[in-house]
């Protein structure tokens, strides 16, 4: 039987006892954070090895320069403006799922694990969910079979009066809280969470291999997200400081996971993809922030530094070693690609933005498709081929900037990294990302090259806008009452807290 | 017999018929221009392969952020402030050898080929010499046996009245001039010079192999120096535009040269080093300028973008494949390393700044040594370990900057990329290049880390300054009469021009 059903084969193992599995690594890291992508301290031997054995994507994008919307896009294959992971509280404002958010992933969305489940997959998420923390948004209600991790970011510590510490779940119930039961030392940066997440991954893989069940593992760790942390054995080991320590621990973990797959003899049956949910947060640099290599700005922006991501596909025996692809890729493609590997069809009742990358990965094809750069409710920029047109520019407001909040530290391109929202709808700013990957030299409006490229891109925009049906925005309303006061399982632990009265209001999204 | 005399063995081949040879590639390219260093279009498969088979240096420096002084430093193993390749016409001004320069490499300097000659080497320079073009500075008077290339930059075309076109030499005599006999089409960027230089290299290597003579080949090409050029077959083939076309042609040439060594069976007897004489000239970006990856600014500055260079050592069978070194290295080390390979001692009557890198390359050792960043006559900055202290900062003057001359386009770090020369002697600006490779976040003066690091670096500076004997500055005087009016051999070609009367004056160095 054809082994093409590699990743997401239906039901039980094939006659050949092929185990068909998939793993996605997702974390907050910049394009320039890996040795294979030119990080000058070159401290990621395992990821570099993964790249050498697999395929490196140099033009791979997230769907949004912020965590929650990107993750929602990955799991639904749809832009945040469709799946509801955006806000209309302000123009072009980024929004995510802090613990006072009321919204989350709508039931109407079909998530990758829900679809894979029908094909017999056991799905596990390890790490940060970030698609809403109220009961109806729980990952096990959206296709995952297992979960170990947290619903929100590991911010804290909180005082349990104004704000409870974020819970950590095992499956349906919480098993403790960050800073209380799962320590993060903000002074030293020590926390053993990555080790816990690693062990979870290894155990899950072993279990699936033993039971010969195909699996989908979504390893969504967050050690490189501020507050950055690393285990004791990695603290102080990097040239890059605490952030580098965290990267090294993740690199080590990836090596151990890939090695585990090989030891168990299932590496040729496991499609693994490594990428990030947004660019490095330069606002946290250098202590807690990574590198976007030669690209402009970082997280929160629709410049390349905010949305171009490191990406590696690994599947020994199928993907030729050492491959390099210039395919314009998106995290949303992982949705479509996984379905394709499973022999499943994507849902036909809705627009799917992801494309099937298998022809790219297995046959080296290049598929012509645009990349849309959204910030909240606004289409800020579009890339087609090597051209990128900005229809709106801004980094953040003067007000924020004057307080020292800087998404582009050390970088300033006049008229480009603007601190007011500037519209360029009628004369978009155009860059050639081959000659000018750093978006520093807008093409002359008068040039023929400009006119040809903009004409093409504007056609794509028109088509996109004409067919766009925005989803109900999920990230508009906040309410202290919905915070993690009494998550399921809190009673057993004596960790239930009293919620304040409900007082829903518009969330404030400053940038 | 021990094969340790690999590179520069004395006299004729050993009993084992070992041919001991060396090649240095030197060109104007930025740290971030190679795929192996994270260039996002990854168009250098041959150089990346060279790195995979050899050792990648991530912390390798040139001796000056400008061409002539760097090349003089490489060939003498000495800082430009010692060998005379600097100016005292203005404080901290860069200077080089345009065709009206009066000075050049002093006879008192001992060049690498002069020393190797004594050990039986045949030495050839292909490409740009740049150590002075008046008769006494001719490369064949300084140890080279053969030359094909030009004494100065390929600027032009000139009108032969105000300024003659730069000659191209074969050995002692000119064989034509740029733009006249060696075409460079400034409109299309077409020129077949790299192909000529490639063929010269292949022929020279073949000849040396046939005669079993050890050789030193210095392949100092200049296609990536503005005006950037490429051969017809490479024009339009790069994502990166003309600059990328030139890089691709160089990459292809390097591949052909390494392949030739392998075909001839002498790759294991040939130590090859690839590096650059200064960072990418961002002032020429994006059309004619490369990338310095994550580093600050470019050519002309003493920020990392101006002086940290791509560097690869290749020596199959000796250097373990895939090695990566964090050794602080310098182009001046190529002088000392080559002598060491030849079993020769460096001259003992003068200060040599280069160190022998063999323990690093062959045994993976790390040698503690500082890097001094000079701009003209001023020590601007010093690196020790991961710390870099700036004693002076400036990019260029406000006057130049206001005319659009920008060495840091899109980059601006307050108080760092200054447009006045700012002295920090008593409180140097300190950066940790591991956590902050982009030199964007100066350490707090009050921190213990600052005090410890600056104390150490200041000790190194004191020691360096106390023993420094500056050479007679060679780049102070310019005179139209010394231009390439009638280079040797011009009579045979009918290409002699009449020189104007001598009118020496101080050269003007704007930055």
Q: Predicted segment positions?
A:
Chain A
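Formylglycine-dependent sulfatase
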Residues: 2-428, 437-476, 480-511
């Amino acid at each position: 039987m054809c082994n093409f059903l590699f990743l997401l084969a239906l039901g039980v193992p094939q006659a050949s006892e092929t185990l068909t599995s998939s793993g996605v690594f997702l974390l907050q890291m910049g394009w320039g954070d890996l040795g294979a992508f030119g990080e000058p301290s070159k401290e990621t031997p395992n990821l570099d090895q993964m790249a050498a054995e697999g395929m490196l994507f140099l033009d791979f994008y997230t769907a949004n320069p912020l965590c929650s919307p990107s993750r929602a896009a990955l799991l639904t294959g749809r832009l945040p403006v469709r799946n509801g992971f955006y806000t209309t509280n302000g123009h072009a404002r980024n929004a995510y799922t802090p613990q006072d958010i009321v919204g989350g992933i709508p039931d109407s969305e079909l998530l990758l694990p829900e679809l894979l489940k029908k094909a017999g997959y056991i799905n596990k998420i390890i790490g940060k969910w970030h698609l809403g923390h109220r009961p109806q948004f729980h990952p096990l209600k959206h296709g995952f079979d297992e979960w170990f991790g947290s619903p929100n970011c590991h911010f804290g510590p909180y005082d349990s009066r104004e704000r409870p510490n974020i819970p950590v779940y095992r499956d349906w119930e919480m098993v403790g809280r960050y800073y209380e039961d799962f320590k993060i030392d903000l002074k030293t940066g020590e926390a053993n969470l990555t080790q816990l997440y690693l062990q979870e991954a290894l155990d899950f893989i072993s279990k699936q291999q033993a039971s010969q069940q195909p699996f989908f593992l979504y390893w969504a760790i967050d050690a490189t997200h501020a507050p950055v942390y690393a285990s004791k054995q990695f603290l102080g080991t990097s040239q890059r400081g605490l952030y580098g320590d965290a990267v090294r621990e993740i690199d080590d973990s990836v090596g151990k996971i890939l090695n585990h797959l090989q030891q168990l003899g299932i590496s040729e049956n496991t499609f693994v993809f490594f990428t990030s949910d947004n660019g490095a947060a330069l606002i946290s640099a250098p202590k807690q922030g990574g590198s976007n290599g030669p690209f402009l700005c970082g997280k929160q922006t629709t410049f390349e530094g905010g949305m171009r991501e490191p990406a590696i596909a690994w599947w020994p025996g199928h993907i030729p070693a050492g491959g390099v692809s210039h395919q314009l890729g998106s995290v949303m493609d992982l949705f479509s690609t996984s379905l394709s590997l499973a022999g499943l069809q994507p849902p036909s009742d809705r627009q799917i933005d992801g494309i099937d990358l298998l022809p790219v990965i297995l046959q080296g094809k290049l598929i012509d498709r645009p990349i849309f750069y959204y910030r909240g409710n606004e289409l800020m920029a579009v890339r087609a081929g090597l051209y990128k047109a900005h229809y709106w520019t801004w980094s953040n407001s003067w007000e924020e900037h004057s307080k020292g909040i800087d998404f582009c530290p050390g970088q300033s391109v006049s008229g480009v990294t603007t601190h007011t929202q500037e519209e360029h709808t009628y004369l978009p700013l155009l860059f050639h990302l081959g000659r000018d990957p750093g978006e520093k030299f807008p093409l002359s409006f008068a040039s023929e090259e400009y006119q040809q490229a903009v004409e093409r891109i504007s056609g794509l925009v028109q088509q996109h806008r004409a067919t766009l049906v925005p989803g109900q925005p999920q990230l508009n309303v906040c309410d202290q009452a919905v915070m993690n006061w009494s998550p399921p399982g809190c009673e057993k632990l004596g960790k239930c807290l009293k919620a304040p009265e409900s007082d829903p209001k518009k969330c404030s999204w400053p940038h």
